[in-house]
Amino acid sequence: MKRIIFSLSLLLFIPGMYGQNGHITLEECQQKTQDNYPLVRQYDLVEKTKEYNLENAARGYLPQFALSAKASYQSDVTELPIAIPGVDIKGMAKDQYQVMLELQQQIWDGGGIRMQKKKATAEAEIDREKLNVDMYALNGRVNDLYFGILMLDEQLAQNALLQDELGRNFHQITAYVDNGIANQADLDAVKVEQLNTRQKRVELTSSRMAYLKMLSLLMGEVLSTETVLEKPVPQNELSAVSEIRRPELSWFDAQGAGLQVQEKALNVRHLPHFGLFVQGAYGNPGLNMLKNEFSPYYIAGVRYTLKNDRRVIENKRQQLDSNRDVFLFNTRLEMTQQDQSVRSLEKQMQDDDEIIRLRTNIRRAAEAKVANGTLTVTEMLRELTNESLARQAKAMHEIQRLMGIYQLKYTTNH
């Protein structure tokens, strides 16, 4: 007995091995997906890359050593064009060798190293904001699956009501057959509708299981078929003119800040950069080109550099501004469409209850006519189907409205 209790306790604490049998909300699904998605690990990689780049930039203050070796053979070498009597001047050898150690020390770079650090920080911020954009897109995928399951749940609920109603009609028509009011064909017509409804339930159940499996994969934990997805309750009302808070805007801002850093870096590069260098070498020839033998030598001096490419940054800034404007335009267009869709559904929902009431009255009247022998069972079943479709339409309108509200919420990031 103790062994059984221990085994059950162990199963309860194995991550990803238990079914979520209770209730779960949309926000919980979104958060679990964010935590489980493999892309989340790249946040640490971005931070580490930033640290490495900052360390590399800081090394610019340290002396830089470089060791090089060279061996070459020239097809021709420099020679004196004249002969001097009594003087034997040997020309340079065609095979030449050199080993050099160079030391460079930055004296003043006009703030170049400081700008490299700012650039590393700006690039890390751009990468981080891009990750935020990609991670935020997961919410849209979760929304589609979550509301897809809610729609299937409503259809399954209406399917169960229709099955109950058909079962009641089957017993009623059976009594009519016994009393000679209806015949076997009428009973078969009801049976066909029962079978069609049963097939539809199998299809809906299969679709729900597929959606649950996809949602489970995103979340990283198993959702059982008994899991109840709670209908979300919107906390605030949104419209087509609501403020846009999408992470893409922060990404655009980070890119703009990065271009500002690059522009400031260009200003730094316009300033003279000074550094000392010392080269010590051993080779043949040495600095004396006319001496054909291995010899050591050194060179010391001051180095100056200057560069310029400002137009590239201006083009990138214009492209970034264009991308931002296009994003805002498309987002506003999408918000307008979503807002109009929600308002249209709300207007339709105003008549749903009345349509159901009227369809119910028509179906009851049809049943009474069947009992009196003035209406066929097939015609009565048609009215029963119409009533069921009216109830399904109301349920779908409610879920579609919720989905539209949360699509608008996703589009604006509210």
Describe the role of every protein-language-model region.
Residues 42-57, 134, 138-157, 211, ...:
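Amphipathic alpha-helical coiled-coil segments
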Residues 41, 64-83, 93-94, 104-133, ...:
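Small/polar (Gly/Ser/Thr/Ala-rich) solvent-exposed segments
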